[in-house]
Amino acid sequence: SHHAVTRQQWQVLCSSSLAAGCLRSGDLHWPTIGTDGEPVLIDLSSSDQLSAAQAAALLHEQTLTIARLAIRPRVLVVVGGDTLLALCRALGANSLISETAMDRPGWGCARLAGGIWDGLVCHTRSGAFGSENDFLEVISELQKNFRSS
């Protein structure tokens, strides 16, 4: 997204202690994404202005690459409805099953049904709103939950 709110949230996240996990869409050539168990944070937005058709084609290609290269994560966080739909299609998920969402404004949670990441829990929200720390706080909360379980 080129939206200022989303850009600021990515900047805060990638300036944090999680910066080593921040990838741009051009970094999706790794042999395997996510092999070290640390969060992998992938900003799929293009640095160029794109038409709607170009953006859709790029997102399709990016999500197919993620489906092909990424190790199945313990949990998934996706921002943006178009991104979630494209990723579900790339992974072969045929539906989402509602789960209990985090206690955060605008965030939802569902389990992927079908496909190569069947059963994976996904926290999601639409793009372009929230505080500048929203991404960082969500990732930090999920990490804390995994450490305590």
Predicted regions, residues:
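Active-site catalytic microenvironments in core metabolic enzymes, especially phosphate/sugar-handling
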Residues: 1-149
